[in-house]
Structure formats: structure tokens, C-alpha cells
């Protein structure tokens, strides 16, 4: 083999290895965009965790209304109202973070496709596009994992707000007693919402680990 052919072969191998190492996106800006996408996933995940805590707080305040109905449920009801408002606010933040994450992912994969379109080596380009399609499919699986949560949360939140209105007009012992069935339903449905949150959190962890390059833990 001539020196010139050897150099060309080594260059091709090096290019191929670099592409494989970064899952098809061999530029600094590319992995930074992947990190940004990972950060978006982490922020979305964090808001969902906050949502779980907000549900716990809401259910706790609802229980306190039931236990204090025969004495003085006013303070417990005020806390319940605050918890419902906080939960609604947190839900808005989850939606916002979800949109941010989606936009960052879209930018990441668009940049990846653009850069790989400029790659001259057909083998490298083919590998890169194959990896991109696989990871993009993984990223888009987040939306599917979020569907049960979206389907459950809206009706449950509406039920909580309706219960809040009911109690605000009838916080008597008899009124609270009459709403016991609604209390039980709110708790049961809230637990199902949290299960869907757990499933989505697990999916987000998996996707983030798949999309972003490995990073050493801080010492």
C-alpha cells in the first residue's frame, strides 16, 4: 500500500471512529446541543417531581379537613385551597418545561441532520443518520409515556377544584361528611396520577442517559 493510500485509509477510519464515539454527531457544538437537550429533560423531570410533592401536600390538607370537621376546619380548608392553587401553578410549569424540552430536542436533531448532510464519507453519513433516527425515536417516546398522565391529570384537577368550591360553600360537619366519597375518589385518582408521574420520570431518566454523553460524577 502506498503512503498516500495508507493516509487516506487511516483518515477514513479516524472519521468513522469519531462519528461512532459520539453517536453520529462528531462536532463540539453537536454534543453541547445534546447536553442542552439533556438539561431540558432534567428540568422537565424536576417539575414532575415537584408535582408529585404538590399532590402529597394537597391530599394531606384534604385529610386535615376531614379530621377537623367537628372542631374547626377553616384553617385546613385554607391550606387545601392554597395547595390546589400551587398544584395548578406547578402543572403550568410542567407544561412550559415540556415545551422547552421539545424545542431543544427538535433543535438538536435538526442540527445533527444538517451537519451529517455535509459529511463526505457515505459510510460515516449512513451510520450517523441511522443513530440519529434511533435516538430521535427514543426522544419522541417521551410524548407517548406522558399520554396517561395528561389523560388523568386534567379531569382529576377539575374534580379537585369542584370539590374546593363545594367545601367553600358548605364547610359544615354535614357538608364534609357528605363529601367523603369525593374525598376518597380524589385520593385514589391522585395516587394513579402519581403512578403515571413515576412511569414518566423513569422514561425521562432512560432517554437522558441514552441521548447525552457520559459524564464523570463530581468529586
Language-model-detected regions and their locations in the chain:
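Bacterial N-terminal signal peptides that target proteins for export
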Residues: 2-14
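Extended amphipathic alpha-helical interaction segments
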Residues: 97, 101-180, 213
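Long amphipathic alpha-helices with heptad-repeat character
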Residues: 41-55, 84-87, 91-105, 146-153, ...
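Amphipathic alpha-helical hairpins
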Residues: 27-29, 61-79, 111-130, 174, ...
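A short structural micro-motif
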Residues: 86, 133-137, 185-189
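C-terminal motif of bacterial Sec signal peptides marking the signal peptidase cleavage site
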Residues: 21-24
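Immediate post-signal-peptide N-terminus of mature secreted/exported proteins
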Residues: 26-89
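Long amphipathic all-alpha helical oligomerization modules
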Residues: 29-40, 154-219
Amino acid at each position: 500500500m502506498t503512503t498516500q493510500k495508507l493516509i487516506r485509509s487511516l483518515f477514513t477510519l479516524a472519521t468513522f471512529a469519531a462519528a461512532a464515539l459520539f453517536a453520529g454527531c462528531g462536532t463540539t457544538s453537536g454534543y453541547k446541543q445534546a447536553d442542552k437537550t439533556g438539561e431540558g429533560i432534567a428540568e422537565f423531570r424536576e417539575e414532575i417531581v415537584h408535582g408529585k410533592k404538590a399532590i402529597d401536600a394537597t391530599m394531606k390538607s384534604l385529610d386535615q379537613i376531614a379530621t377537623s370537621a367537628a372542631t374547626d376546619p377553616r384553617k385546613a380548608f385554607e391550606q387545601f385551597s392554597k395547595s390546589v392553587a400551587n398544584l395548578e401553578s406547578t402543572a403550568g410549569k410542567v407544561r412550559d418545561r415540556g415545551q422547552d424540552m421539545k424545542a431543544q430536542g427538535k433543535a438538536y436533531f435538526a442540527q445533527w441532520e444538517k451537519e451529517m448532510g455535509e459529511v463526505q464519507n457515505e459510510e460515516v453519513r449512513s451510520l450517523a443518520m441511522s443513530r440519529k433516527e434511533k435516538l430521535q425515536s427514543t426522544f419522541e417516546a417521551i410524548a407517548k409515556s406522558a399520554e396517561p398522565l395528561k389523560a388523568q391529570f386534567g379531569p382529576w384537577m377539575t374534580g379537585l377544584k369542584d370539590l374546593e368550591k363545594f367545601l367553600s360553600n358548605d364547610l359544615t360537619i354535614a357538608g364534609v361528611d357528605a363529601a367523603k366519597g369525593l374525598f376518597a375518589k380524589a385520593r385514589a385518582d391522585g395516587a394513579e396520577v402519581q403512578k403515571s408521574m413515576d412511569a414518566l420520570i423513569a422514561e425521562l431518566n432512560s432517554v437522558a442517559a441514552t441521548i447525552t454523553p457520559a459524564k464523570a460524577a463530581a468529586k
